[in-house]
């Protein structure tokens, strides 16, 4: 007998207040890394009507023009006028960044780099499944693509009455673990006051929703909710206060996998909240790409100042082709999950982080990028270059 289930995930646009904050925090991190690859950075941002507050702890030899960085991020998103809800050219900027505690430094820094301890205790999860081409859950992938398309239509002038703030939500129907349809779509987008709701709903349906979602997953009973409350003129930081790290489920797997609770943005790779979560995705994706399982969730945990993980566990939800004990053994053989080794394995000491701060940290395509004289690959944790090694070691 067929087993049906529904699962829903949401995403938000780059103009959502929390995502503005994430992008500012990661832009500051990138600017510091350009000058000092080994800086210790933990930057938090708050945005609200007419002001951006940047706080945190930084240990670095670099000097960056924080005010200009903040203004550039806000303006590039599209907030360039108080009419839109925020103006990056004129907003107030408050800088309350201090130095990192020497007590933390002594727990992290080591004479031998490979012995570098974790920057904090914590648990992190990585996940992958074979239900999409990027080995991610379909609901979060489709939710991201909707708000990415909203930004594209806004910035290109295709739908010039769109404004930066938007949210999406997609409910997928599963049969025996496979996606067979989309039951509901929600898209709320900020807009200027001149556009009628009827015109907005028609344009969004044709040029965003139907343009983005696979036609074979849409059916006659699919529900569409486009700006279901009606008018959405006031948005961005005027509508809601934005904070770094408040969209951790949007950033990861849309709720399909568990989350350790640590946010990503504004943190340098010595913080395992970020680097070990990226490593977890890398491990899980390679396990699925190798055919060892159709779904895989990995948990790692750390103690502050200690290099080796305190635990590694795997859950394949009954889809494994070899035992989970064998998979854990292979993970320990193929992947070095000490913090310094993760940084080297994924080549994380580059200004790659602002690109991660909107539309999800996972399921993205690695790209070659050059910043100044530094050329590197983004989203390295999305590579599947360990799949062949895992498959061979498993005897498949």
Swiss-Prot record:
Binding residue positions for L-methionine: 57, 100, 240, 271
Textual note on the cofactor: Binds 2 divalent ions per subunit.
Major localisation: cytoplasm
Annotated GO CC locations: cytoplasm
Keyword Cell division belongs to the record: no
GO terms of biological process kind: one-carbon metabolic process; S-adenosylmethionine biosynthetic process
Subcellular location: Cytoplasm
SUPFAM superfamilies named in the record: S-adenosylmethionine synthetase (SSF55973)
GO molecular function: ATP binding; magnesium ion binding; methionine adenosyltransferase activity
Residues holding K(+): 44
E.C. number: 2.5.1.6
UniProt cross-references to Pfam families, sorted A to Z: S-AdoMet_synt_C (PF02773), S-AdoMet_synt_M (PF02772), S-AdoMet_synt_N (PF00438)
Residues spanning the membrane: none
Keyword ATP-binding carried by entry: yes
InterPro entries in alphabetical order: ADOMET_SYNTHASE_CS (IPR022631), S-AdoMet_synt_C (IPR022630), S-AdoMet_synt_central (IPR022629), S-AdoMet_synt_N (IPR022628), S-AdoMet_synthetase (IPR002133), S-AdoMet_synthetase_sfam (IPR022636)
Binding site for Mg(2+): 18
Cofactor(s) named in the record: Mg(2+); K(+)
Pathway: Amino-acid biosynthesis; S-adenosyl-L-methionine biosynthesis; S-adenosyl-L-methionine from L-methionine: step 1/1
Catalysed transformations (reactions): L-methionine + ATP + H2O = S-adenosyl-L-methionine + phosphate + diphosphate
Family of this protein: Belongs to the AdoMet synthase family.
SUBUNIT field: Homotetramer; dimer of dimers.
Database matches in NCBIfam families: metK
Protein name: S-adenosylmethionine synthase
Species whose genome carries this gene: Ectopseudomonas mendocina (strain ymp) (Pseudomonas mendocina)
Organism taxonomic ancestry: Bacteria, Pseudomonadati, Pseudomonadota, Gammaproteobacteria, Pseudomonadales
